[in-house]
A protein has these predicted regions:
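N-terminal Sec-pathway targeting helices
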Residues: 1-11
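Conserved metal-phosphate-binding beta-hairpin within the catalytic cores
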Residues: 244
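Extracytoplasmic cell-surface/polysaccharide-interacting catalytic and binding patches
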Residues: 19-109, 116-239, 249-263
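Sec-dependent N-terminal signal peptides of Gram-positive bacterial secreted proteins and lipoproteins
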Residues: 12-16
Length: 263
């Protein structure tokens, strides 16, 4: 009798475990799209230009000029969506840098899970390397998962992360940051060639596989953006100078999947 009871309990536990995984909890990191419960509630999101009217948009994943060379799933319009909390904080950043002669230029904001799944599929296709010369010339595509350039989840999907740069209102050009958005390499690290604690330019480029470097001016430009973002409640990302997340993000454990389009 005990054997039958224990067998029944085990069966129930297996069913419960399967239900738990189906709801989107993934214990093992694999090179496949993570299963998340599709959350299509965009009620707490705003169109960024409604909050920051003078922001410049260049939504790379709506275009084909990105590391995949394809328009990415889920980007139905070239607009930026963010949680209201993140958009309000970004307005404060905009006011700050505007006083210094700059405008914000946005590459990406909220990113649906279906877009992240698209990245995962692309990274798994080792033959699709059309954009390698422009975004990852020093890397074999097979290492993108291992080195975490591509992952199954993204902070962008929680709605309070933004990729951006500065636009110089005097020159009417992007401020020269010494590297392009979505460059896969150490040259994109915020501390590349400099000390973030002291703000000192060191010129240390030992991590660059090709001995690339950035100038003192380019490092200083990165610091202008970084200081403004940190001053208004955003936290940086250690490997991308353009990537910031609201510290007090309202949905730290929720991954949304509604498309990027006008509300």
């Amino acid at each position: 009798m005990k054997k039958y009871i224990l067998g029944g309990i085990a069966a129930v536990l297996i069913v419960i475990g399967c239900m738990w995984v189906a709801k989107g909890h993934n214990c093992k990191k694999e090179n496949t799209a993570v299963a998340v419960s599709a959350n299509d509630d965009n009620s707490q999101f705003v169109t960024l230009t409604d909050v920051v009217p003078d922001v410049i948009l260049e939504i790379r994943y709506f275009s084909t000029y990105n590391f995949a060379g394809q328009r990415i799933d889920g980007y139905e319009q070239p607009i930026a969506l963010l949680t209201k909390a993140a958009a309000d904080s970004l307005k404060a950043v905009s006011d700050d840098v505007k006083a210094q002669g700059y405008r914000l230029k946005i590459y990406d904001a909220y990113r649906p899970q279906k877009a992240v799944d698209h990245f995962v599929r692309w990274a798994s296709d080792l033959s699709a390397t059309e954009m390698k010369p422009y975004f990852y010339p020093d890397l074999d595509k097979s290492v993108l998962f291992k080195q975490e350039y591509i992952a199954e989840k993204s902070g962008h999907t929680r709605g309070s992360t933004v990729d951006l740069t500065l636009f110089d209102m005097n020159t009417e050009k992007e401020l020269d940051m010494g590297g392009t958005f979505d460059w896969f390499g150490p040259e994109s690290h915020p501390d590349f060639c400099g000390n973030l604690d002291t703000g000192e330019y060191t010129g240390d480029n030992q991590l660059s596989p090709k001995g690339r470097s950035i100038t003192a001016e380019q490092f200083a430009h990165r610091l202008i953006l970084r200081k403004a973002m940190l001053a208004h409640g955003f936290k940086p990302f250690p490997t991308e100078w353009w990537h910031f997340t609201l510290k007090d993000e309202p949905f730290p454990d929720t991954y949304f999947n509604f498309p990027v389009k006008q509300k």
